[in-house]
Amino acid sequence: MYVSNCNPCAIHRKINYPNTKLDFEQVNNITEFILLGLTQNAEAQKLLFAVFTLIYFLTMVDNLIIVVTITTSPALDSPVYFFLSFFSFIDGCSSSTMAPKMIFDLLTEKKTISFSGCMTQLFVEHFFGGVEIILLVVMAYDCYVAICKPLYYLITMNRQVCGLLVAMAWVGGFLHALIQMLLIVWLPFCGPNVIDHFICDLFPLLKLSCTDTHVFGLFVAANSGLMCMLIFSILITSYVLILCSQRKALSTCAFHITVVVLFFVPCILVYLRPMITFPIDKAVSVFYTVVTPMLNPLIYTLRNTEVKNAMKQLWSQIIWGNNLCD
């Protein structure tokens, strides 16, 4: 809730970034935010509830199958599958931080989220997003070594290196999310508290702050949008160079490029721009928070014979094991 007689100008003159808990409480009178959600149409909400519940179920099942298959199959012991299992794990975690709340809100009349819950959601969203960005770079490097320098692949991508690269992804994602959250958490919010979105995101929150946030908007565009554009360009260029040197790698690179495009293009559309919001932002956010985590495991396993054979073997062991037990 927010205090209607709050004077934003007085607060802004007093302090922009509070340094103590007392100052923070004085400038922040909002304890919760109201989310307008995807739509106000009751029939559309019921339809979206069914669709998103199915998508979330498929996302969790698909990614869980990939993680279990890779971790239990000796045939999938190479670094590329180690990174793929980790990527599927992150996809499942990322989807679980957004989808359940969004699905639940489709059935509730008043969609609210506490201030601390909003900051937590913002942090987790950008944490997993940052981890996935770094992991996509790692997977591109792994693809380059495997295709262009196959004789040195197992030496270059040994267990220690793979573990270090994954640890770097975790640390990089944490630092990215921490910067984004600290950018928002100390801003003064004194009303209104209505977010025209289904999640807490940077630009909608910046618009609600009762201080000038144009500089912060530029920082977000640079830290998220420009960085995504730069990494996206590097990844696409890398895969093109791999294809130029090894045309036989077309199918492998095509799947990697598809995942990169599905991940980065929506992020670039949302963050690489001035601090303004559009109605289409919700649809774009739905795509990269709900749909993309479901598509990624399908794309990576669609024509991967080794993964499909390992899945068949796993299911055979499960079925025959159950029959033997019976």
Curated annotation (Swiss-Prot):
UniProt KW keywords: Cell membrane, Disulfide bond, G-protein coupled receptor, Glycoprotein, Membrane, Olfaction, Receptor, Sensory transduction, Transducer, Transmembrane, Transmembrane helix
Subcellular location: Cell membrane
Extracellular side: 1-46, 101-121, 180-216, 272-282
Cysteine disulfide links: 118-210
GO CC annotation terms, alphabetical: plasma membrane
Glycosylation-annotated residues: 29
Spans within the Cytoplasmic topological domain: 71-78, 142-160, 241-248, 303-326
Family label: Belongs to the G-protein coupled receptor 1 family.
Designated name of the protein: Olfactory receptor 4C5
The organism's taxonomic lineage, starting at the top: Eukaryota, Metazoa, Chordata, Craniata, Vertebrata
Protein's gene: OR4C5
